[in-house]
């Protein structure tokens, strides 16, 4: 894990407090971690789609990629954003669950398609029935960015921080 340049360390602490292991691993490339930080900040705080919906998209991607790190980190954020325990519990079967409305199901179908690498005309059409093009683009970027995050975590062998290891439900139960 890298140590940060002073300016980057200050910025990371402003945004996230103690930088998580993902940022410490990315810190081996200061220019990329700086760009990544600002882009992820924009996705988290400067978007129009509801945070709750974006967190559902992120959690579903984490399930599909079996990314324990991403799942554990975003469970806290999802709960804080208003995702219900029932939705978390039924996320792996969202398409047949009554816990999700039509808009959420359209976003989750899009999240799955983006994460798995192919958005069909049907998935796109259903998403565009619920979202205008601005929000559709946002959701596509969120799903794609967090799919990249999951893949980077795996490729770099980033371990979940000890204080984040006690979470429920476990990804393995999903």
Predicted segments with their positions:
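Hydrophobic alpha-helical segments
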Residues: 1-174
């Amino acid at each position: 894990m890298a140590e940060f340049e002073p300016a980057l360390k200050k910025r990371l602490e402003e945004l996230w407090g103690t930088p998580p292991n993902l940022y410490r691993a990315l810190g081996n490339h200061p220019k990329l971690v700086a760009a990544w930080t600002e882009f992820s900040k924009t996705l988290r705080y400067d978007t129009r789609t509801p945070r709750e919906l974006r967190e559902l998209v992120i959690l579903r991607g984490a399930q599909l990629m079996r990314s324990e790190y991403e799942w554990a980190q975003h469970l806290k954020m999802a709960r804080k954003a208003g995702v219900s325990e029932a939705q978390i519990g039924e996320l792996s079967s969202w398409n047949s669950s009554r816990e999700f409305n039509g808009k959420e199901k359209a976003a989750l179908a899009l999240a799955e398609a983006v994460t798995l690498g192919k958005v069909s005309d049907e998935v796109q059409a259903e998403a565009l029935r619920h979202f205008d093009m601005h929000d559709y683009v946002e959701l596509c970027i969120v799903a794609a960015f967090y799919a990249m995050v999951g893949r980077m975590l795996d490729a770099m062998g980033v371990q979940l921080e000890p204080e984040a290891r006690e979470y429920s439900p476990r990804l393995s139960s999903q």
